[in-house]
A protein has these predicted regions:
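Hydrophobic beta-strand-centered segment that forms part of the acyl-chain substrate-binding groove
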Residues: 48-102
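Short, intrinsically disordered, mixed-charge
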Residues: 32-36, 71-75, 121
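A generic structural signal for short beta-strands and their flanking turns/coil linkers
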Residues: 11, 18, 26, 37, ...
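Well-ordered beta-strand positions in beta-sheet-rich domains
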Residues: 19, 81-83, 128-132
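HotDog/MaoC-like acyl-thioester-processing domains
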Residues: 1-15, 89-92, 99-139
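Catalytic strand-loop segment that frames the active site of acyl-thioester-processing enzymes
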Residues: 1-55
Length: 139
């Protein structure tokens, strides 16, 4: 369901999950675009030489995927804050599933709190966090 205004939001509502493109090619392009090019983002072998299990999905890219999930659910929302904890690396070429659930609604202020996760295809939580989102009170 697409949220138009704060009255459309339901406590406990789960946002539609999102599986972004975490291919090595996409992660490499993103890393270079933000000035983070290097083996850990551009090559599985290079990342392994640095002690990682494979090439990494840049952390800010994962946060971007979280914001995409929010805006797909509520296109007119303004994201006030996203707070994340990176529990384990996100690995390129591995499915990442972004999920979120509404955990608080302040109708007077037009604010919604979301608990968010990024899990891999084995169901392991790689990133977790919360988002505070301002949603219009009327369409």
């Amino acid at each position: 369901m697409t949220v138009e205004n704060i009255n459309d939001v339901e406590f406990g509502e789960e946002l539609a999950s999102f599986t972004p493109d975490t291919s090595l090619e996409n992660c490499s392009k993103f890393a270079r675009a933000v000035g983070w090019g290097g083996p850990r983002f551009e090559s599985h072998e290079g990342a392994q030489k640095e002690g990682f299990p494979g090439a990494l999905v840049p952390g800010i890219m994962g946060m971007g995927f979280m914001t995409s999930t929010i805006h797909a659910w509520a296109p007119s929302a303004k994201i006030e804050k996203i707070d994340t904890i990176f529990r384990a690396p996100m690995i390129a070429d591995t499915a990442s599933i972004i999920g979120a659930v509404v955990t608080d609604i302040d109708s007077d202020e037009g604010l919604v709190e979301l608990d968010m996760t990024i899990k891999n295809d084995a169901g392991e939580t790689r990133v977790l966090g919360t988002a505070t989102v301002r949603i219009p009170s009327s369409p």
